[in-house]
Design a protein with these regions (language model features):
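C-terminal domain-closing interface element
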Residues: 353-355, 511-560, 566
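Residues forming the flavin
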Residues: 483-485
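Thr-Gly-centered strand-to-loop micro-motif
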Residues: 447-448, 467-468, 858-859, 882
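A short, small-residue-rich loop immediately preceding and capping a beta-strand
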Residues: 463-469, 487, 857
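Nucleotide/phosphate-binding sheet-loop regions of phosphoryl- and nucleotidyl-transfer enzymes
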Residues: 2-408, 442-445, 452-454, 463, ...
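Protease-associated
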Residues: 377-461, 524-525, 529-530, 545-550, ...
C-alpha cells in the first residue's frame, strides 16, 4: 500500500463507525487498557498497559488488538483500523515531540507481535521502523554517532526485507559477512560507518532484485506493511507448530505493539537485556538474566553473541541495576508470579520494554509455587494452578549414568534446560524431521550454531539440543525449557560447521549419525553413548507439592501395568490401583511364547488345554507379583485381547524362510515345522484384524483360554490372601458389544472362581466388568450393566471405531487435517469430547441408571492427557488409568479439574 493509498483508506473510513476499538494507547503515565485485557491486547500489550499505569519507565506506544488480526485472517479488514492507528501515531508523535521518520529528530518505532499466550520467537518483529535515506542522516547528526545510525538502518532493511518482503535472510547475511571479511572485522560492532553504508547499498540492491521494488522510503508505508506482516506471522509454520504443541487456539490471533524505540546500541553507555525475577530452570529465588552493552534486543536472544550475566551489570552500572531490581521486584509482587522482563539502557537511562509471567521448567514451576506460598504471595489452591500438568514430567527426565563409566567431556556450555539426552547428531531441523520420520535414528540430538524459530519442527522430534552460541535466554534455551527437553547452549569450544555437517571440538570431528550425550543440568557435552536413568520422584519439592494436590482431587488415578516391576514403579509415582493389566504381554516372554504358539497350533481342545496348562503357573506367578506389589489396591486384569496371529511369526517372514530352504536345503527337517506353522498363520490371517477374531470373541470360540486365565488370577489371589495379603481383583472382558457376549464370559469367570474357592477353602472378593470400546457397547450400556459390575472405556479403540480411523495409519493424513483445521488436535492424544466423549458420557449415565453403584474409568492413552482427565472429572468418572510416567500429570490435572468445578460449579454442558 502506497502512502497515498494509506491516506485514501483513512479518508474512506472517516464516514463509518464501529463499536470495536481497535487501537489502545499507552504512555504519559496512563494507558487505555490494563493487565486483565490479554484476550484483547495480548500478553505483551496487556503488560505494557499495566506497567504504564503503574508509573514505570515504559516507552510509549499503542497496541492494535487481536480482533484486527482475526479480521485480517478472514480477509475482511475494517478501514477503521488505519483511522485509529494513525490517530494513535499522531498522539505518540505529540507526546514524544517527534515525527515518524522525518525532521531533525525522527521518531522510530518497533513493531512486535503479542498473543494472549506467550509464544517466544514464533512470530515476527521489526525494529527501527521509520528510518529511510533522509532519517538516517538526521539520526546520525542528532546522536553524533554515525555508526549507530547506519547500523540501525541496515538492521531495519534486513528485518523488513526478511519479515515483510520475504527476501531470504541468508542473502542478507551473505552480504554482511562478506563486508566483514573484506574489512578484516571479527565482531559486528567493529564495522565502521563507511562499511555500514556499503552494506546498506548492497541490501537495497538485494531488495530491488528480489522484489522488483525499492525499499519503501515512506514511513507510513513501512508501518502498514510491517503491521500486516506481523498479522501474517501468526500463520507461519513455526507458529502453527508451536500452537499445536502447546494447544493454543489457532483463531486467537496476535495483537501488534507499536512502541517508540529506545536504543541499546547508541554506544558503550547503552545496552539491552532480558531477565527473570527467579531462575527459570531451577526456580531458585535469585535475580537471573543476561545483557549486552551496545546492542539491540535481538542480539541477546538470537544467540549471535554470547551475553553477560546480569550480575555483571551491578558492577558496571550499579544505579541502573538497583533500579531494575526494584522495578522487577515490584512487578513480581504485583502479578504474584515470576516475571520475564526485557529492558533497554539508553545513555544510562533504564527503560522497561516488557514484563510477563515467565516460562519455566517443571522443576522451577513447582519450586516457585511452593516458595510463593511460603512468602504469602499465593494460596495453596493457586499454587495447584501455577504448574502445567505436563510440566511434572520434568521430574522424571533421564539422568546420565556416570558411575563406573569413562567419561570424555568435550565441552561445557550453559545448562539451558535440565535432564539428559543421548542420541545421534544431525545438523538441520529438516534432517531431524526426516531421520525421525524414516526411523534412520531412533534418538536424535540437534546440533546448531544457534537455533532460530524456523528450527521448531526439528526441535520437536529431537531428544536434546546443543548450540555453540547463545545464552540462558536464547531461543534454544527458552523453547526447550517449555518443551521439557534437554538443552546445552553456548558451548563455545564447539565449532558447528552446518554446511559440511560437522562438529569440531578438542581436535575431534563428529559427523551426522555420531553419538553424543548431553547433560542439560550441568551443561556438559560428552562423547559417546552413555546410559541414562530416570529421575526419582522423591524430590522434596515434588513431595510437598503433591501433598497439596492429592487431597483436592476427586478422581482416582490408576496405572496401566503388566508386570510386577511396572506395578512397583506405578506405586512410586502415586498410583491408587492398576486400571489395565494386559495379560497377553505376559505371553511374549521367551520361556512362554513356545507354549502359546503350541496352544494356537493345536487342532483340538485337548491339545490346547495341555498347552494352556503349561502357561497357567507362569500367569499365576505374574498375578501374584502384581497383587503383592499393589497390596490392597484394586488390580484390573484384562483377559486376552489381541488376535492369535500376533503370537505367531509374520506370514511374509515364513514365506521367505520356506522359499529359501526349498531352494537351498529342500530336505531340511525345519521345513516340516514351518509348513504347518505357515498354514495356521494363513488360516488365522484376517483382512481387518482390529475388528476380527480378538477380545471376548476369542474367549467365546476358545473358552478354555478364559478358563485358564481366570484360574490363574483366582489361584494367585488366594495364595496372596493366604500369605496375609488383601488382593482386590477386578476381571475385565475386552471388546464387548452386547449383553449376550458379556453373559457368556462372565459365566465362565464366575464358574472358575467358585471352583477355585471351593478347592482352596478361601474366598476372595472380586468384580467382573468389561471394556467399552465399541459404539454399540456404549449405546447398549444400560443392558450390559445388568451383568458388568464396572466399565472401563478403552478410548484408543473407541476412538478408532467411532471415527473409523486406524490409529496406525492416521499419520498419513493427520498433518493435513491439522493444517486445514479439521482436527485441532490428534484424537488419539486428546479425547474427542464432542463425539467419542459423548459416547463415554452417555454410556456412563445409561450404565448407572441400571446399576447406580457402577464403577467407571478409562484406560486408554487419554488417561494421561490433562484435557481428557478434566473431561473425565466433569462427567463423573471414578478413575482414569495411564502409563506410570504420566501419573503425576494425571494427578495434577484431576486436582485442577476439582478446583475449576469449585470455582464455576458442576458442569452442565455437553463437555
Amino acid at each position: 500500500m502506497t502512502q497515498g493509498a494509506v491516506e485514501s483508506s483513512v479518508a474512506s473510513a472517516t464516514s463509518t463507525s464501529t463499536p470495536t476499538q481497535y487501537v489502545y494507547f499507552f504512555g504519559g503515565g496512563a494507558a487505555d487498557g490494563n493487565g486483565k485485557m490479554k484476550d484483547v491486547l495480548g500478553g505483551k500489550g496487556a503488560g505494557l498497559a499495566e506497567m504504564t499505569n503503574a508509573g514505570l519507565p515504559v516507552p510509549p506506544g499503542f497496541t492494535i488488538q487481536t480482533e484486527a488480526c482475526r479480521e485480517y485472517m478472514r480477509g475482511a479488514v475494517s478501514p477503521e483500523i488505519n483511522v485509529e492507528m494513525f490517530a494513535a501515531l499522531e498522539r505518540l508523535e505529540a507526546l514524544q515531540g517527534q515525527k515518524l521518520g522525518t525532521g531533525e529528530n525522527p521518531l522510530l518505532v518497533s513493531v512486535r507481535s503479542g498473543a494472549k499466550f506467550s509464544m517466544p520467537g514464533m512470530m515476527d518483529t521489526i525494529l527501527n521502523l521509520g528510518l529511510n535515506d533522509q532519517a538516517v542522516e538526521a539520526l546520525a547528526k542528532l546522536s553524533n554517532n554515525p555508526r549507530f545510525a547506519y547500523d540501525s538502518y541496515r538492521r531495519l532493511i534486513q528485518m523488513f526485507g526478511d519479515v515483510v518482503l520475504d527476501v531470504p535472510k541468508k542473502k542478507f547475511e551473505h552480504i554482511f559477512d562478506g563486508v566483514k571479511h573484506r574489512t578484516g572485522v571479527k565482531f559486528d560492532y567493529e564495522l565502521q560507518p563507511d562499511a555500514l553504508k556499503e552494506i546498506i547499498a548492497e541490501y537495497k540492491k538485494l531488495v530491488l532484485a528480489e522484489t522488483g521494488k525499492d525499499f519503501p522510503q515512506a514511513p507510513l508505508d513501512q508501518l502498514v506493511q510491517a503491521r500486516d506482516a506481523v498479522f501474517r506471522s501468526w500463520q507461519n509454520d513455526r507458529a502453527k507448530t508451536y500452537r499445536r504443541m502447546t494447544r493454543i487456539d489457532d483463531w486467537l490471533g496476535t495483537a501488534v505493539n507499536v512502541q517508540a524505540m529506545v536504543f541499546g546500541n547508541l554506544g558503550e553507555n547503552s545496552g539491552t537485556g532480558v531477565g527473570f525475577t527467579r531462575n527459570p530452570a531451577t526456580g531458585e529465588h535469585a535475580f537471573f538474566g543476561e545483557y549486552l552493552m551496545n546492542a539491540q534486543g535481538e542480539d541477546v536472544v538470537s544467540g549471535v553473541r554470547t551475553p553477560l550475566s546480569i550480575s555483571e551489570l551491578e558492577r558496571a552500572m550499579p544505579a541502573v541495576y538497583e533500579q531494575l531490581r526494584q522495578i522487577t521486584g515490584k512487578m513480581e509482587k504485583h502479578y504474584r508470579d515470576m516475571q520475564d522482563f526485557e529492558f533497554t539502557i539508553q545513555d544510562g537511562k533504564l527503560y522497561m520494554l516488557q514484563t510477563r509471567n515467565g516460562k519455566r521448567t517443571g522443576l522451577a514451576a513447582v519450586r516457585v509455587a511452593i516458595d510463593m506460598v511460603k512468602e504469602g504471595l499465593i494460596t495453596q489452591e493457586e499454587a495447584i494452578h501455577r504448574v502445567e500438568p505436563n510440566q511434572l514430567y520434568d521430574f522424571l527426565v533421564p539422568r546420565l549414568v556416570e558411575k563406573g563409566e569413562k567419561i570424555e567431556v568435550l565441552a561445557t556450555g550453559l545448562p539451558a534446560s535440565p535432564g539428559a539426552a543421548v542420541g545421534q547428531i544431525v545438523f538441520t531441523a529438516e534432517d531431524a524431521v526426516k531421520a525421525h520420520a524414516n526411523g534412520t535414528y531412533k534418538v536424535i540430538i540437534l546440533v546448531r550454531g544457534e537455533t532460530t524459530p524456523e528450527d521448531i519442527a526439528g526441535m520437536e522430534v529431537a531428544s536434546g539440543i546443543l548450540t555453540s552460541r547463545g545464552g540462558m535466554t536464547s531461543h534454544a534455551a527458552v523453547v526447550t525449557r517449555g518443551m521439557g527437553k534437554c538443552c546445552v547452549a553456548g558451548a563455545g569450544d564447539c565449532t558447528v560447521d552446518e554446511a559440511n555437517k560437522e562438529l569440531r571440538v578438542k581436535g575431534r570431528t563428529f559427523r551426522e549419525g555420531d553419538w553424543l550425550s548431553l547433560d542439560g543440568t550441568t551443561g556438559r557435552v560428552i562423547a559417546g553413548q552413555l546410559k541414562t536413568l530416570p529421575a526419582q520422584p522423591d524430590d522434596p519439592d515434588l513431595v510437598t507439592y503433591m501433598s497439596w494436590v492429592d487431597p483436592v482431587r476427586r478422581l482416582g488415578i490408576y496405572a496401566n501395568a503388566d508386570i510386577p516391576r511396572d506395578a512397583k514403579n506405578a506405586r512410586l509415582f502415586g498410583a491408587e490401583g492398576i486400571g489395565l493389566c494386559r495379560t497377553e504381554h505376559m505371553f511374549f516372554a521367551e520361556d512362554r511364547i513356545e507354549h502359546m504358539q503350541a496352544m494356537i497350533l493345536a487342532d483340538n481342545e485337548a491339545d490346547r488345554r495341555a498347552a494352556l496348562l503349561k502357561l497357567l503357573p507362569m500367569q499365576r506367578a505374574d498375578f501374584e507379583g502384581l497383587f503383592k506389589a499393589m497390596e490392597s489396591l484394586p488390580v484390573v486384569i484384562r483377559t486376552i485381547d489381541p488376535p492369535l496371529h500376533e503370537f505367531l511369526p509374520k506370514r511374509e517372514d515364513l514365506l521367505v524362510e520356506i522359499s529359501h530352504l526349498v531352494d537351498t536345503d529342500p530336505s531340511s527337517p525345519k521345513l516340516k515345522e514351518l509348513r504347518p506353522l505357515l498354514a495356521r498363520v494363513q488360516e488365522l490371517h484376517e483382512s481387518n484384524p482390529m475388528l476380527g477374531l480378538r477380545g471376548c470373541r476369542l474367549g467365546i470360540l476358545y473358552p478354555e483360554i478364559t478358563e485358564m486365565q481366570a484360574r490363574a488370577i483366582f489361584e494367585a489371589a488366594v495364595n496372596v490372601k493366604n500369605a496375609g495379603g488383601d488382593p482386590h481383583v477386578e476381571i475385565m472382558i475386552p471388546l464387548i458389544g452386547s449383553i449376550e457376549e458379556m453373559r457368556n464370559q462372565s459365566a465362565i469367570v464366575r464358574r472358575v472362581a467358585a471352583d477355585v474357592f471351593k478347592e482352596k477353602g478361601v474366598t476372595v472378593h472380586f468384580m467382573v466388568g468389561c471394556m467399552i470400546e465399541l459404539p454399540r457397547a456404549a449405546l447398549t450400556a444400560d443392558q450390559i450393566a445388568e451383568e458388568a459390575e464396572f466399565f472401563s472405556f478403552g478410548t484408543n479403540d473407541l476412538t478408532q471405531t467411532t471415527f473409523g480411523i486406524s490409529r496406525d495409519d492416521i499419520n498419513q493424513f493427520l498433518p493435513a487435517y491439522m493444517k486445514h483445521g479439521i482436527f485441532k488436535q490428534d484424537p488419539f492424544a486428546t479425547l474427542d469430547q464432542a463425539g467419542v466423549g459423548q459416547l463415554v458420557k452417555m454410556a456412563t449415565a445409561k450404565g448407572r441408571n441400571t446399576r447406580p453403584t457402577l464403577k467407571v474409568g478409562i484406560c486408554g492413552e487419554h488417561g494421561g492427557d490433562p484435557e481428557s482427565v478434566k473431561f473425565c472429572h466433569r462427567i463423573g468418572l471414578n478413575y482414569v488409568s495411564c502409563s506410570p510416567f504420566r501419573l503425576l500429570t494425571a494427578r495434577l490435572a484431576a486436582a485442577q479439574a476439582a478446583l475449576e468445578e469449585k470455582q464455576t460449579g458442576p458442569a452442565h454442558t455437553t463437555s
